[in-house]
Amino acid sequence: MDDGKMRNLRLRSELFRAIRDCFYRAGYLEVETPVKIHAPAPEEYIESVRAEKDFLRTSPELAMKVLLADGMEKIFQIGPCFRANESGRRHREEFTMLEYYSRGTGYRELAEFTAGFVAEAAERVLGSTRIEYGGKQIDLSAYEFVTVGGRLLQTDFGNLAESWYSCSCRLVS
């Protein structure tokens, strides 16, 4: 195996360990739900992968919500998911998804928890919360909670039309 592949496998393993540590520390229980299911989630924009008479899950969401309904409080799962017709450099039919739920926790608390574990995992795995993505430097610790209403209040609608017509768009195939 070449050095690049080995490095990526090690980074992936370290990342999953760091994420799990964050969830365990926060009192979450790791669960594992079936990958092969009888019926796909009814999402018109997500195409399921057939597996004989059944389907491969597109997300563990439904099975995890059953666990919440059964009384589980804080659960997470890292595991394989499948979506048909996903292809390209950044999309594959099979991928790994992190899904988590905390019953009774508000969306703002969940957003803050997410920002915290993302920054902590980056620091542990990469030694920094600063990453480069799409040619830009991003500081994962510089989390800012933004609401749609808050952004609308900050928007200069006088320049909105000008901004819209001056934007350059291109189709990506």
What are these regions (language model features)?
Residues M1-S173:
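Class II aminoacyl-tRNA synthetase catalytic cores and aaRS-like
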